[in-house]
UniProtKB/Swiss-Prot annotation:
It comes from the Eukaryota. CDD domains: cyt_b5_reduct_like. Keywords: FAD, Flavoprotein, Membrane, Mitochondrion, Mitochondrion outer membrane, NAD, Oxidoreductase, Transferase, Transmembrane, Transmembrane helix. It catalyses: 2 Fe(III)-[cytochrome b5] + NADH = 2 Fe(II)-[cytochrome b5] + NAD(+) + H(+); 2 Fe(3+)-[Dph3] + NADH = 2 Fe(2+)-[Dph3] + NAD(+) + H(+). One of its GO terms (biological process) is protein histidyl modification to diphthamide. The chain crosses the membrane at residues 2-22. SUPFAM superfamilies: Ferredoxin reductase-like, C-terminal NADP-linked domain (SSF52343), Riboflavin synthase domain-like (SSF63380). This is NADH-cytochrome b5 reductase 1. Pfam families: FAD_binding_6, NAD_binding_1. Its cofactor is FAD. One of its GO terms (molecular function) is NADH dehydrogenase activity. Belongs to the flavoprotein pyridine nucleotide cytochrome reductase family. Residues 37-141 form the FAD-binding FR-type domain. It comes from Kluyveromyces lactis (strain ATCC 8585 / CBS 2359 / DSM 70799 / NBRC 1267 / NRRL Y-1140 / WM37).
Length: 281
């Protein structure tokens, strides 16, 4: 064989081999676990108690290398059989695919008269829940807004925390975030350590203001309901590149919608869409 032809043939074979290896690797990469149509079971692998009725529940994925596959800002449906009836509820994981490989986490507050939430409190390690998704009309993208105002009540902090964590972890995302977070008591404030860390490490980008219904004497935050004045003082004014996100108990959400219109925001639609100036989870 002519030396030149040999070199060409060897190079061609090597190139084909490399391409074959790359294609095989790509085909074997773990795909996101979530399925919009199919319910799948995931076992409880850890439980971190935050308050007397709230905990972070960690569920394992089939393989330690897999991710849930949840777009930031969306949620999942959880199904449980309660008294012979299959009941579905929506929850936003507090974990991101980027920091939760092999598992996902849910922040759940259990109520005595709740259905699914009470079911969570009774789970033991190894017990399974049924999940499908993703669901929702919100899909956060870096720098999609210049500023985001957030209002959360109770466990309504979950989608806000997920988005804030994504922004915090991405140095190229310059979105500014102002959060007003209401609770009944100081003990009820969830993920406070994590929220305060965002502010401490990136004070020019993150601002958090806490309100309590029942504040202790030494409390330095806000007291009472989230009023028009509170929103005007603590959140960005309505403008191009500004979006307001809301998640919490229905009475709070209704009040916030009215207050927002008073401040000049567009009226919230019955079903929120991605580009709305006010998006209600």
């Amino acid at each position: 064989m002519v030396p030149g032809k040999f070199i060409f043939t060897a190079t061609f074979v090597l190139l084909c081999t490399i391409i074959a290896v790359v294609l095989e690797y790509q085909s074997k990469k773990d795909k996101p676990v979530l399925d919009k149509e199919k319910l799948q079971e995931f076992p409880l692998v850890a439980k971190t108690v935050l308050t007397h009725n709230t905990a972070i529940y960690r569920f394992g994925l089939p393989k330690s290398t897999q991710v849930l596959g949840l777009p930031i800002g969306q949620h999942i449906s959880v199904q449980a059989n309660i008294n012979g009836k299959d009941i579905l509820r929506s929850y936003t994981p507090t974990s991101l695919d980027s920091d939760a490989v092999g598992h996902f986490e849910l922040l759940i507050k259990s109520y005595e008269k709740g259905n699914i939430s009470k079911h969570f409190a009774q789970l033991n390690i190894g017990d399974k829940i049924k999940v499908r998704g993703p669901k929702g009309f919100y899909h956060y993208q870096p720098n999609m807004n210049e500023e985001i105002g957030m209002i959360a009540g109770g466990t309504g902090i979950a989608p806000m925390y997920q988005i804030m964590k994504s922004i915090f972890a991405n140095d190229s995302d310059k979105t500014k975030v102002s959060l007003v977070y209401g609770n009944q008591t100081e003990e009820d404030i969830l993920l406070k350590k994590e929220l305060d860390a965002f502010v401490e490490r990136k004070p020019d980008q993150f601002k958090v203001y806490y309100l309590l219904d029942k504040a202790p004497e030494a409390w330095t935050g806000g007291v009472g309901y989230i009023t028009v004045d509170t929103m005007k003082e603590r959140l960005p004014a309505p403008a191009e590149g500004v979006q307001l996100l809301v998640c919490g108990p229905p009475p709070m959400v209704s009040s916030i919608k009215r207050n927002a219109v008073t401040l000049g925001y567009e009226k919230a639609k019955p079903i929120s869409k991605m580009g709305d100036q006010i998006f209600v989870f």
